[in-house]
């Protein structure tokens, strides 16, 4: 029996997946059969009705039994109500009271946990029953029931039951639903709504298709909330809203009315309805036509989720259910019950009860994995990791990696490992070996952890060997990027050296080997490789690891590679490699020696003074433009040696400078005139020396050379009287631009006169201004008060008795004396002067004020 049940479950799952095969849309519901006790019941009996409470289920059968079941379908209690079919079961909201009616006219309302009971037998089948939702309360002891008429039973204050007819005369009552203060029921003509508070019927909604037999295609009712009623009948669905009538409209009308807010047709016959948020769950009875016999047959019922619109609906999902015996069932044999609290939907048929549940995140992930949407599944699991129960993020991630590997997306698979494997070192190592098996170690290498966690050295070495065999550049990149403590450095060094035996000039391998040596602190070997390769990092290596002792015999190599950087490094580290050592090492390479000594001289004119004599020859040979600046700046250069070298090489400018520096200005001037034939330079030289004899020699040399005379006339006006030159010009000599030169001389002379006159005016004006200022200052009054003292006797300058006569002398220097304290002026020097200022050589101050009283 268990095997048969398992096969049926698989069949149910296959049927619900039919629409999934046609579409990639995810189903909204999942299904399972209600088994255990239900299976035993339906093997011997058939289900006729069921009602659902949050805590338990109540199932009625064709043999008059009512079973209470837990949510797994286990039987908890059994009631023998009637020998015939149970038509309907009703529970109050508390789940403590139940009403049952049967085909033989029996009616029972009783407490499940108390002795409270009401029973009645009618002479006609009782089709429906609904107890008040708050039946547990003494003020709400009411229920409705009916067959051909709808009766309301109420318990009076004397604990007796009385009944009243709410409606009759429109055929059998086939469906009823009670919500709050509203009762909705359906008969052959339509749906009525009754307000239990006002005791008024407030609406009548007629059925659309009167051609359908109401006993074969019964009406389905459900309340979405206290004011929203959903009606399904035939292929029509109506959503009705109970509204309050405005006071001005009431007159003799009920205070409430029903408005149809949405109405639309469906493709199939409706067997049941249930709300799902703002959507509807619809159980449909399906008839199809056989292609072979062209006869109608009963197809599998469908459970659809639809989105109601004002005049139509949108299908969200649709599942065909393979319930037991569906080929023999009619529309009236199916019922849809639901649990509002847990969104559970029960599809009830005579031989089967199927539970539909909203799919949770685990189900969503199942579907994504089934559709091989691993990326979305992983994302969904991460977002809902607190809510998922059956799935683990790691398992989904590993499945995703395997999927990518199977598809050949090795780089993507390796990239995802970073996120999925995280800090799990053992999983990392496992995945690396998997990549090795498929020959894709290179793909995972960029994503291996390098810090936290750290894998076994063998893992990193295995990948390095893989690159070393096929990709030198990739190998070099990994060596640069990976910290050296990840692997056994000596093992990799030996592997590289083995490869260099086959290709000794491979620059990539040599450079990588140098980096490995550097990490291994074998700087000497690394330095040799860098120098051989002329690698730019050689200077950084020397500085960083203080390898100056290792380069003392490699200075020429460094200079050949980059003389500028080498010289800067050597000069910055004179304390480690002396100037003498560098000069000795470069003895056979004078051009490099010059570069070094030249930079040394630029930094400090005195440090390399012992080599200044050598530098004369070096500058003359390799850098003449800097020879003259060197001669000018050096104070340790032997002038005779320098003069000898410059004369040998016929360096005129340098020779002129040396001659002038040695005091032989006349020879220097003569050389300028005879060798350079440059009157401007000669004039400039004469100006620098500022020697009259030189000007005389210059005039004598130029007197028979008209171009030189022109140059002199144009330039000597501010240094030598031009008349001396003009008087010596031979009569009749043609001098180029003589007029312009004379005009320039006159202009220069006139300019000098103007400058002198201007200076004179400024001087006179300043003197007059200062004189006036001094006069104004001396004319000002001088304050004399009790605090002033006589500079001679040091007593207060003013007497304590103001009535006594006194005489005070105040000089322009502001020193004050009693008149009697000053010596009397002599006949030879009638003017008086301040004794203090005269003694300090500040100049005599004359009296400016004499106060008497």
From Swiss-Prot:
Subcellular localization, as worded in the UniProt entry: Endosome membrane; Late endosome membrane; Early endosome membrane; Lysosome membrane
Any one GO MF annotation of this record: microtubule binding
Gene3D superfamilies assigned to the protein according to its UniProt record, in alphabetical order: Tetratricopeptide repeat domain (1.25.40.10), YVTN repeat-like/Quinoprotein amine dehydrogenase (2.130.10.10)
Oxidoreductase among keywords: no
Annotated CHCR repeat ranges: 567-711
Annotated InterPro entries: Clathrin_H-chain/VPS_repeat (IPR000547), TPR-like_helical_dom_sf (IPR011990), VPS41 (IPR016902), Vps41/Vps8 (IPR045111), WD40/YVTN_repeat-like_dom_sf (IPR015943), WD40_repeat_dom_sf (IPR036322), Znf_RING (IPR001841)
Source organism (scientific name): Mus musculus
Job description of the protein: Plays a role in vesicle-mediated protein trafficking to lysosomal compartments including the endocytic membrane transport and autophagic pathways. Believed to act in part as a core component of the putative HOPS endosomal tethering complex is proposed to be involved in the Rab5-to-Rab7 endosome conversion probably implicating MON1A/B, and via binding SNAREs and SNARE complexes to mediate tethering and docking events during SNARE-mediated membrane fusion.
Signal peptide, first to last residue: none
A single GO BP: late endosome to lysosome transport
Membrane topology: Peripheral membrane protein
Subunit structure: Component of the putative homotypic fusion and vacuole protein sorting (HOPS) complex; the core of which composed of the class C Vps proteins VPS11, VPS16, VPS18 and VPS33A, is associated with VPS39 and VPS41. Interacts with RILP, MON1B. Interacts with ARL8B (GTP-bound form); involved in recruitment to lysosomes and probably hierarchial assembly of the HOPS complex at lysosomal membranes. In vitro can self-assemble into a lattice. Associates with adapter protein complex 3 (AP-3) and clathrin:AP-3 complexes. Interacts with STX17; this interaction is increased in the absence of TMEM39A.
Residue segments, region Interaction with ARL8B: 1-539
Main location: membrane
GO CC annotations on file: AP-3 adaptor complex; clathrin complex; clathrin-coated vesicle; cytosol; early endosome; early endosome membrane; Golgi apparatus; HOPS complex
Gene: Vps41
Species classification: Eukaryota, Metazoa, Chordata, Craniata, Vertebrata
CDD domains in the record: RING-H2_Vps41
Alphabetical UniProt keywords: Autophagy, Cytoplasm, Cytoplasmic vesicle, Endosome, Golgi apparatus, Lysosome, Membrane, Metal-binding, Protein transport, Transport, Zinc, Zinc-finger
Composition-biased stretches (Acidic residues): 1-25
Protein name: Vacuolar protein sorting-associated protein 41 homolog
Pfam family, one: TPR_Vps41
Zinc fingers (RING-type) by residue: 790-838
Segments of this protein annotated with the region Disordered: 1-32
Family classification: Belongs to the VPS41 family.
């Amino acid at each position: 029996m268990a095997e048969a049940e398992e096969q049926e479950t698989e069949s149910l799952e296959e049927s619900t997946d039919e629409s999934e095969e046609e579409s990639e849309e995810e189903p909204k519901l999942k299904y399972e059969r209600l088994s255990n006790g239900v299976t035993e019941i339906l093997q011997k009996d058939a289900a006729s009705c069921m009602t659902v409470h949050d805590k338990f289920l109540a199932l009625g059968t064709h043999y008059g039994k009512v079973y209470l079941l837990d949510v797994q379908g286990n039987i908890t209690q059994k009631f023998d109500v009637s020998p015939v079919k149970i038509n309907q079961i009703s529970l109050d909201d508390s789940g403590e009271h139940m009403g049952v009616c049967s085909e033989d006219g029996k009616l029972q309302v009783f407490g499940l946990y108390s002795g409270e009971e009401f029973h009645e037998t009618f002479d006609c089948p009782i089709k429906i029953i609904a107890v008040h939702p708050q039946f547990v309360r003494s003020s709400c002891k009411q229920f409705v029931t009916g067959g051909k008429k709808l009766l309301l039973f109420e318990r009076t204050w004397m604990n007796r039951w009385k009944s009243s007819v709410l409606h009759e005369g429109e055929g059998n009552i086939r469906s009823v639903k009670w919500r709050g203060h509203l009762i909705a029921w359906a008969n052959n003509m339509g749906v009525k709504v009754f307000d239990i508070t006002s005791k008024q019927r407030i609406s009548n909604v007629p059925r659309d298709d009167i051609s359908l037999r109401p006993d074969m295609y019964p009406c389905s009712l459900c309340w979405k909330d206290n004011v929203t009623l959903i009606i399904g009948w035939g292929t029509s669905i109506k959503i009705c809203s109970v509204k309050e009538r405005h006071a001005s409209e009431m007159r003799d009308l009920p205070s409430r009315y029903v408005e149809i807010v949405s109405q639309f047709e469906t493709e199939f016959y409706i067997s049941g309805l249930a709300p799902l948020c703002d959507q509807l769950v619809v159980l449909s009875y399906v008839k199809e036509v056989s292609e072979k016999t062209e006869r109608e047959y009963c197809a599998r019922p469908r459970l659809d989720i639809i989105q109601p619109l004002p005049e139509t609906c949108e299908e969200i999902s649709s599942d065909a259910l393979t319930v037991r015996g569906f080929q023999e069932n009619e529309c009236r044999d199916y019922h849809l019950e639901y649990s509002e609290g847990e969104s559970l939907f029960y599809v009830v048929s005579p031989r089967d009860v199927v539970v539909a549940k909203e799919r949770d995140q685990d189900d969503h992930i199942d579907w994504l994995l089934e559709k091989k949407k691993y990326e979305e599944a992983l994302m969904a699991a991460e977002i809902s990791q607190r809510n998922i129960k059956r799935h683990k993020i790691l398992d989904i991630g590993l499945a995703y990696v395997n999927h990518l590997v199977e598809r050949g997306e090795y780089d993507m698979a390796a990239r995802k490992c970073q996120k999925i494997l995280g800090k799990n070192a053992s999983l990392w190592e496992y995945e690396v070996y998997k990549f090795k098996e498929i020959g894709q170690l290179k793909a995972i290498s960029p994503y291996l952890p390098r810090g936290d966690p750290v894998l076994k050295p063998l893992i990193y070495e295995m990948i390095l060997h893989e690159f070393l065999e096929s990709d030198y550049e990739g190998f070099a990149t990994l060596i640069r990027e990976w910290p050296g403590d990840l692997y056994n450095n000596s093992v990799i060094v030996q592997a590289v050296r083995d490869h260099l035996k086959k290709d000794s000039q491979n620059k990539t391998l040599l450079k990588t080997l140098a980096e490995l040596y550097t990490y291994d602190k074998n700087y000497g070997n690394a330095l040799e490789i860098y120098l051989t390769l002329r690698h730019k990092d050689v200077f950084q290596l020397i500085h960083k690891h203080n390898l100056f002792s290792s380069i003392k015999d490699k200075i020429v190599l460094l200079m050949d590679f980059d003389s500028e950087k080498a010289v800067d490094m050597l000069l910055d580290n004179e304390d480690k490699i002396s100037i003498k050592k560098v000069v000795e090492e470069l003895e056979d390479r004078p051009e490099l020696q010059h570069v070094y000594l030249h930079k040394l001289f630029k930094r400090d004119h005195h440090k390399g003074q012992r080599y200044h004599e050598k530098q004369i020859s070096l500058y003359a040979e390799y850098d003449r433009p800097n020879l003259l600046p060197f001669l000018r700046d050096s104070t340790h250069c032997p002038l005779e040696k320098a003069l000898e070298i410059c004369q040998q090489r016929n360096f005129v400018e340098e020779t002129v400078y040396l001659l002038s520096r040695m005091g032989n200005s006349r020879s220097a001037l003569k050389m300028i005139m005879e060798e350079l034939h440059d009157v401007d330079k000669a004039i400039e030289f004469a100006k620098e020396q500022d020697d009259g004899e030189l000007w005389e020699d210059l005039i004598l040399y130029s007197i028979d050379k008209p171009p030189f005379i022109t140059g002199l006339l144009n330039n000597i006006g501010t240094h030598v009287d031009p008349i001396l030159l003009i008087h010596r010009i031979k009569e009749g000599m043609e001098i180029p631009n003589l007029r312009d030169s004379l005009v320039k001389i006159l202009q220069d002379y006139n300019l000098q006169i103007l400058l002198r006159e201007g200076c004179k005016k400024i001087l006179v004006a300043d003197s007059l201004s200062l004189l006036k200022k001094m006069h104004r200052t001396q004319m000002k009054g001088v304050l004399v008060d009790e605090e002033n003292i006589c500079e001679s006797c040091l007593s207060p300058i003013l007497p304590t008795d103001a009535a006594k006569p006194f005489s005070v002398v105040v000089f322009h220097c502001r020193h004050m004396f009693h008149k009697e304290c000053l010596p009397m002026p002599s006949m030879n020097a009638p003017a008086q002067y301040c004794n203090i200022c005269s003694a300090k050589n500040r100049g005599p101050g004359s009296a400016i004020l004499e106060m008497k009283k």
